[in-house]
Each structure stands twice: as structure tokens, then as C-alpha cells.
């Protein structure tokens, strides 16, 4: 676990990441991972998932276990715990406040969750629309 966590680019400030994601000049696709204990265990079982985590542009400590391990093993006392939900809500608010129409693409595991997500975003964010919803098989 120590070696794995040490190799990650753990993010301590979500505001900076959101600024980078919203930068109109930066057209490159960005990959964010919200790592918790469950997803860490999955990396041990799934080599493709582990490679995806290791190649991510941004890795957030989205679980108390990862957060504490980072602080204990690597003295990352500055590291904030940033949950996927909090980050996502902040990102959607920033996207919507740009007053420009933005398109979203979601990948998820269950159709029912994607439908609920789509409805909530349509109801609450007037500048955001969907290009696609995709299930993972």
C-alpha cells in the first residue's frame, strides 16, 4: 500500500483542479479518480484499473483510509479529504456559472443511477446538457 500511495499524485486543492478543467485553452481530456479503500482493493484485483489510477491526472483522497494512510506514511498533513460528491457538485456549479452551454458525458454502472443523475442536472443546471449516458458492462 505504501508504494502505491506514494506513486500517486494526490491532490490537496480541488479549486485549482476545477480551474484547470475549466480553462478554455486546455482542450486535453483530463482523468480524475476519487480513491477510497474499496477502489484501492479493486486495484489489487484489476491490473487495468490500477494502471488507470496510476495514469490519472488527478487523484483525490476520497476515503478516510486513503486520507489517513497519506498522512501517516508520507507526512501529507496538508492533504484535504475531497469526496467525489463535493468535487462534482463544485464542478457542476462552476460549469453552470460560466453562462456558456456545456456538454456532459457520463459513464456509469447502473442505468437507474444515470437517469437520476441526468434528471437532477437538467432540473438544477440550465447551462448543462448531455451528449451521452453510457453503461459499463
Q: What residue spans do the PLM features occupy?
A:
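Conserved beta-alpha
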Residues: 67, 72-137
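N-terminal nucleotide/polyanion-binding subdomain common to many enzyme families
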Residues: 1-85
Amino acid at each position: 500500500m505504501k508504494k502505491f500511495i506514494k506513486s500517486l499524485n494526490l491532490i490537496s486543492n480541488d479549486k485549482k483542479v476545477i480551474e484547470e478543467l475549466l480553462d478554455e485553452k486546455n482542450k486535453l481530456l483530463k482523468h480524475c479518480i476519487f480513491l477510497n479503500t474499496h477502489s484501492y482493493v479493486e486495484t489489487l484485483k484489476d491490473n487495468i484499473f490500477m494502471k488507470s489510477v496510476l495514469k490519472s491526472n488527478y487523484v483525490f483522497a476520497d476515503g478516510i483510509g486513503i486520507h489517513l494512510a497519506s498522512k501517516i506514511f508520507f507526512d501529507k498533513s496538508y492533504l484535504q479529504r475531497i469526496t467525489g460528491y463535493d468535487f462534482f457538485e463544485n464542478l457542476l456549479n462552476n460549469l453552470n456559472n460560466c453562462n456558456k452551454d456545456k456538454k456532459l458525458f457520463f459513464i456509469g454502472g447502473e442505468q437507474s443511477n444515470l437517469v437520476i443523475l441526468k434528471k437532477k442536472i437538467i432540473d438544477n443546471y440550465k447551462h448543462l446538457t448531455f451528449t451521452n449516458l453510457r453503461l459499463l458492462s
